[in-house]
Amino acid sequence: MTSYRPFVVLEAATVLSGTAAGITMVAFPWLVLQTTGDATAAATIAAVTAVPLLLSMLVTGSAVDMLGRRRVAVASDLFSMCAVALVPILALTLGLDYGLLLVVAALSSVFDPAGLTARQSMLPEAAAKAGLDLERANGIHESAYGFAFLL
């Protein structure tokens, strides 16, 4: 029996997570530029968000295999959300310190590859349940992720 629900839910999660990741990649450097006026500091925070992203990619496949696809997808998005939620909390309590923003920016990006990998590994099963061939499902999935960054 064909059920589109798992595929639609997976793609909705992909769009939401991708949109959040895209916004964060722009928002942190922009926030630093607005608060400090220093372009070098903005570039530094952009690099700080990229380096943990690259390093965490090395272990995401193993984490997905050991902990489970759905669990890793949900947990990575929750951890990323909590890291980003620290920005207004810090702004209201301690103030927006550049050093704290560097730490929060690094934390916000370290979890994204695990969620992306977990959602990609769920694609074949969701596509099969929806009656889609894998090539079409993969095209839809990658388009959804690309669309998310445009938002």
Predicted regions and their residues:
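Alpha-helical transmembrane-bundle signature of multi-pass membrane transport and export proteins
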Residues: 1-151
